[in-house]
Structure formats: C-alpha cells, structure tokens
C-alpha cells in the first residue's frame, strides 16, 4: 500500500437499487448520501441499478428518475463527489449531459467485459464534459486476464483515466483477481488508475477487494450493509474495518459507516442481502447478480426452482442485458419437466 490513500467509492444508491427493485425514495437517497458524505467516502454513485435510463420494462421501473435521484443526493453532500453509471445502449450522451447538469461529476461507463469498443463515444464525451471518467468492465470473470487487459487498453485509449475489474457475478476468487490486476498493470499507463467492484456471492467480496489493493488497485467499490445485486457488494463497513486492521489509509469514519449500514440501509431490505441458496448459485454458476430478483419472480410464476433457472442461465453464458432470456429459460425448463 506504501501509505497512499484508497479512493472509497460507495455504490449503495446504484447497485443497491437492485436489492429493492429500484424503489429508493428521494428522502432515503438524501439521508443515505448525507450519512456517507459525513463518513468521508470519496464518491457516491447514484442511478437506477442498470445505470442512466435503466428504468424500463426489461430491467424494472424506478420509483423516480435518475435525474431526480442525482439532484437529491447532490443536495445532501458537501465533500463527496456524486458518481453515476452509464451502459452504452441504455443511456445516451444526452442522458449523461443531463446527469452532469444535475450534479454528477464522476461517470463509470460500463460494458460487457469483451465489448469495450461500444464505450468509445461515451468515454470521449464524458472527458469533454470534464468528468472523472472510468471504464467499467462487467462480468470480468468471463474472459482471460490477458483478454481483459486488451479491453482495458481500449477504454484507456478512448480517454478513461481509471479502469475497473468488475466481478458482476461474484464468481471470482483471490487468484482470479490477482491475475487480472497483474494483467491490467502490465499494459496500462502507470498514471491510469484501477478499481475493483466485487460481489459477495461466494463471500469473497472483501477478500477480493483486499487482494486487488495488494496488487496496486486505487479505488474500491463497496456498499453499506453490502446493499447490492445478488448477495450484495463488498460491505463497505466490513471492508473499512479490515483495511483499518491492515493499517491502510481510507479517510472514512468506520463507526459512522456501521451506524448508517444498520440504521438506514438494512431496514430497507425487503429480501435479505446475504449469501443464501439462490445468491450462492449466482456466484457458483457465474451469473450476472442482478438476474436474482428476475429469476425469483419467474420461478414463482412458473412453479420452478430459482436455482435451476440460475444454473441454466450460467450454462448458457447469459450476460447483463439478456434479462428477457430468463423467462425463455423458465419456459424451457417447464417443457423439460413435463
């Protein structure tokens, strides 16, 4: 770590959206953003779980617009930067500009790990706006470390100043993370930062984040009480406690984070965010974590097991954006069971 300060990127108000089907109220967003700001995090990501303009029939409708959520969070902070997420093809340049005008100063442009080239325009435009521009390679477990590094290079060439390894399926272990960071570091410019976005489906969210930092990672994504898709993200308060024990500089108030997690966030969970039969299946099968609630709904509708649906999705190598295939898989299983 050599005494550098970690950049703590909170995702409670974006990835955490998945855990409550994108239903945060504006008051809740203000309360949580305010608490995170006081606790000293560097950035607070705010958007529908699937990024700007994710509110849709396919992904689930949000209680509010991204812009309303971003404005609410921006009004509640004095130190932290407001971040947002954009998936090219869902969000447009127009949406990014609107988010910037509403107060977002960091954008993470997210693509499937093998499709960095779809982000070129959005990354370039974010740089033009003067935003802190991050490339976000989702489902990073699905390609080799060397292939991932080539995609990271593309994002860097478009103008991203930080590249993330994103374990959307919560499917990687510490060796997988180590290998990917070494591969990225071997090809990226020394001034290009790196980040880690973990999911806790195999209970390795914190361990994987620690290994990333050991390999030179600069930014860590985490959320209060792990609020996020699947078994959630690396729980922020747990990661900070572990980082503290390691003597790492993080600039946040552990007790304030612990209080916010238990008093503000955990009570909102209508389905516990934890490792259980279904969320473990996500990590084991390497499935996109936000498929959880959609698969549980399909299982209920067709009288199937959510685990069977998730395992089949893993076999078919489905990725984010293919939510419509969940019903397809359910109907196939139904016919198979006849």
Swiss-Prot record:
Listed InterPro entries: 2-IPM_HCS-like, 4OH_2_O-val_aldolase, Aldolase_TIM, DmpG_comm, DRE_TIM_HOA, PYR_CT
Entries under Pfam families matching the protein: DmpG_comm, HMGL-like
GO annotation terms (biological process): 3-phenylpropionate catabolic process; L-leucine biosynthetic process
Associated pathway: Aromatic compound metabolism; 3-phenylpropanoate degradation
Parts of the chain that traverse the membrane: none
Keywords in alphabetical order: Aromatic hydrocarbons catabolism, Lyase, Manganese, Metal-binding
Site (Transition state stabilizer): 14
List of residues binding Mn(2+): 15, 197, 199
EC code(s) of this entry: 4.1.3.39
Segments forming domain Pyruvate carboxyltransferase: 6-258
Listed SUPFAM superfamilies: Aldolase, post-HMGL domain-like
GO molecular function, one term: manganese ion binding
Record-linked PANTHER family: 2-ISOPROPYLMALATE SYNTHASE 1, CHLOROPLASTIC-RELATED, HOMOCITRATE SYNTHASE-RELATED
Assembly notes: Interacts with MhpF.
Function recorded in the entry: Catalyzes the retro-aldol cleavage of 4-hydroxy-2-oxopentanoate to pyruvate and acetaldehyde. Is involved in the meta-cleavage pathway for the degradation of aromatic compounds.
Protein name in UniProt: 4-hydroxy-2-oxovalerate aldolase
Species of provenance: Klebsiella pneumoniae subsp. pneumoniae (strain ATCC 700721 / MGH 78578)
Lineage start: Bacteria, Pseudomonadati, Pseudomonadota, Gammaproteobacteria, Enterobacterales
């Amino acid at each position: 770590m050599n005494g550098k300060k970690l950049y703590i990127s909170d995702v409670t108000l974006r990835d955490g959206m998945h855990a409550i089907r994108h239903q945060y109220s504006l008051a809740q967003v203000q309360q949580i953003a305010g608490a995170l700001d006081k606790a000293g995090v560097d950035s607070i990501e705010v958007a529908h779980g699937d990024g700007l303009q994710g509110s849709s029939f396919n992904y689930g409708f949000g209680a509010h617009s991204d812009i309303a959520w971003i404005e609410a969070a921006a009004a509640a902070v004095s130190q932290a930067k407001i971040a947002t997420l954009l998936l090219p093809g869902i969000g447009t340049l127009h949406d990014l500009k609107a988010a910037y005008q509403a107060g977002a100063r960091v954008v993470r442009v997210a693509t499937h790990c093998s499709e960095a080239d779809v982000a070129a325009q959005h990354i370039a435009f974010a740089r033009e706006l003067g935003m802190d521009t991050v490339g976000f390679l989702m489902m990073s477990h699905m390609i080799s470390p060397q292939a991932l590094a080539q995609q990271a290079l593309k994002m860097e060439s478009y103008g991203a100043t930080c590249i993330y390894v994103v374990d959307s399926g919560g499917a990687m272990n510490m060796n997988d993370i180590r290998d990917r960071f070494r591969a990225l570091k071997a090809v990226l410019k020394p001034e290009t930062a790196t980040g880690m976005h973990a999911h806790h489906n195999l209970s390795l969210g914190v361990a994987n984040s620690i290994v990333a930092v050991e390999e030179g990672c600069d930014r860590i994504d985490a959320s209060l009480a792990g609020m996020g898709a699947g078994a959630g993200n690396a729980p922020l308060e747990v990661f900070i406690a572990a980082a503290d024990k390691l003597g790492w500089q993080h600039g946040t108030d552990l007790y304030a984070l612990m209080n916010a997690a238990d008093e503000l966030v955990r009570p909102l969970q209508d389905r516990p965010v934890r490792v259980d039969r279904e969320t473990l299946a996500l990590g084991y099968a390497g499935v996109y974590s936000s498929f959880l609630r959609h698969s549980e709904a399909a299982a209920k509708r067709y009288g199937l097991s959510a685990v069977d649906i998730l395992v089949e999705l893993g076999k078919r190598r489905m990725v984010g954006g293919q939510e419509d295939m969940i019903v397809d898989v359910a109907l196939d299983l139904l016919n198979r069971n006849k």
